[in-house]
Amino acid sequence: MCDLIEPQPAEKIGKMKKLRRTLSESFSRIVLNVISFVFQICVTKMSTRNCQGMDSVIKPLDTIPEDKKVRVQRTQSTFDPFEKPTNQVKRVHSENNACINFKSSSAGKESPKVRRHSSPSSPTSPKFGKADSYEKLEKLGEGSYATVYKGKSKVNGKLVALKVIRLQEEEGTPFTAIREASLLKGLKHANIVLLHDIIHTKETLTLVFEYVHTDLCQYMDKHPGGLHPENVKLFLFQLLRGLSYIHQRYILHRDLKPQNLLISDTGELKLADFGLARAKSVPSHTYSNEVVTLWYRPPDVLLGSTEYSTCLDMWGVGCIFVEMIQGVAAFPGMKDIQDQLERIFLVLGTPNEDTWPGVHSLPHFKPERFTLYSSKNLRQAWNKLSYVNHAEDLASKLLQCSPKNRLSAQAALSHEYFSDLPPRLWELTDMSSIFTVPNVRLQPESGESMRAFGKNSSYGKSLSNSKH
């Protein structure tokens, strides 16, 4: 029998709540600084399962002595995702800005009291880190966890994106917000959205980002039927460049999808929304398998695996690559996890222990649940891959059911698909845009650009002639 809890006087309860709020506020302020420090000192303790072609700085698990291994624990529960269908999945994006992470939180009121990041300046001038240093111009999107505004800095006049996170009265700062802020503070790269400022008040935490006017989802919606092949190549190169940067720092994004890839008016692609990102060296109980929008979620995670590494992001890269070329999502599941897996296996083949060692040990893999499919050439599923030299080969090396077989971001940058790009692109510093290299620019989009490219390319012509 459970012990009963005696009722507490109202006055005592009020004092306890006040104490809890005070401790929560203090903790959230401290943790924003501490977690970055912990992240830096823990990186050498990281161990990972390797993707193909991963840099030697990330060592395969089997090269680490047994007494030095740090493993993520797999937690198996009685939950079966196949027994209860999820809601129909739809591709959506936040209005005019992808840099928003919808999570649960309660609304709060604004407070002028500033907690962090004050910069020295005159007493009457606007300051970085001050709530009144930014003017809200328009709302871009809203969720239960955060609201994003287009704003303007009163300090330098630049446009910004203000991600206003409402703090729970008793719980303090959501950990997803702390995680995003702490990771982005240390990331400086041309292909990662820049965090300008952090404003912490009693009721809100505001992350001030550079303003980027659209995202890849909106860009593809505006140009249906597949993007210009040269633009696909430049977008993919930038995506891999940004991922290689964070993967070398032992950070997984974990939520790659077109909505989280911002596109500037000059064509720069920037990784955004690091609310689910994880520093692999920071200990945690287990990685949740409820990450990544269903269409871009890899089969190992769909089957319940909680032991994953940078290879998780590389599956999403493959899906986005195919979608940019084909003009439709690679695996647009419409029902549930079962349907999503069936769509994957229809193209890549139903896995077994020979094609994917260890698949039978995954929590939700039951062979009798799946139709037995054999693998096929990717061009049979997505014909436009055949229009572009080496595109099918690169896609096939990214879309591997077994995570260990997926190409790493660094290795993908060296793939033949990119061989016709200027060599200077591989020599750029982290903060240099690819568009600083002469003759590197986006091409005009048209509805028939991919089809026209296929007919005019030597590869496309050879395929066309082989049909006659």
From Swiss-Prot:
Enzyme class: transferase
Phosphoserine found at: 24, 77, 94, 133
Main location: membrane
Residues that coordinate or bind ATP: 140-148, 163
Residues in Protein kinase domain copies: 134-418
Domain of life from the UniProt record: Eukaryota
InterPro entries in the record: CDK, Kinase-like_dom_sf, Prot_kinase_dom, Protein_kinase_ATP_BS, Ser/Thr_kinase_AS
Biological process (GO), any one: Wnt signaling pathway
Cell compartments where the protein resides: Cell membrane; Cytoplasm; Nucleus
MF GO annotations: ATP binding; cyclin binding; cyclin-dependent protein serine/threonine kinase activity; protein serine kinase activity
GO cellular component assignments: cytoplasmic cyclin-dependent protein kinase holoenzyme complex; cytosol; nucleus; plasma membrane
Activity control mechanisms: Serine/threonine-protein kinase activity is promoted by associated cyclins CCDN3 and CCNY and repressed by CDKN1A.
SMART domains the UniProt entry points to: S_TKc
Positions of disulphide bridges: none
Region (Disordered): 102-131, 448-468
Biased composition, class Polar residues, residue ranges: 455-468
Membrane topology: Peripheral membrane protein
UniProt keyword terms in alphabetical order: ATP-binding, Cell cycle, Cell division, Cell membrane, Cytoplasm, Kinase, Membrane, Nucleotide-binding, Nucleus, Phosphoprotein, Serine/threonine-protein kinase, Transferase, Wnt signaling pathway
EC numbers, comma separated: 2.7.11.22
Active-site annotation: 255 (proton acceptor)
Stated role: Serine/threonine-protein kinase involved in the control of the eukaryotic cell cycle, whose activity is controlled by an associated cyclin. Acts as a cell-cycle regulator of Wnt signaling pathway during G2/M phase by mediating the phosphorylation of LRP6 at 'Ser-1490', leading to the activation of the Wnt signaling pathway. Acts as a regulator of cell cycle progression and cell proliferation via its interaction with CCDN3. Phosphorylates RB1 in vitro, however the relevance of such result remains to be confirmed in vivo.
Subunit structure, interactors included: Found in a complex with LRP6, CCNY and CAPRIN2 during G2/M stage; CAPRIN2 functions as a scaffold for the complex by binding to CCNY via its N terminus and to CDK14 via its C terminus. Interacts with CCNY; CCNY mediates its recruitment to the plasma membrane and promotes phosphorylation of LRP6. Interacts with CCDN3 and CDKN1A. Interacts with SEPT8. Interacts with 14-3-3 proteina YWHAB, YWHAE, YWHAH and YWHAQ.
Family, per entry: Belongs to the protein kinase superfamily. CMGC Ser/Thr protein kinase family. CDC2/CDKX subfamily.
Protein name stated in the entry: Cyclin-dependent kinase 14
Organism: Oryctolagus cuniculus (Rabbit)
High-level lineage: Eukaryota, Metazoa, Chordata, Craniata, Vertebrata
Gene designation per UniProt: CDK14
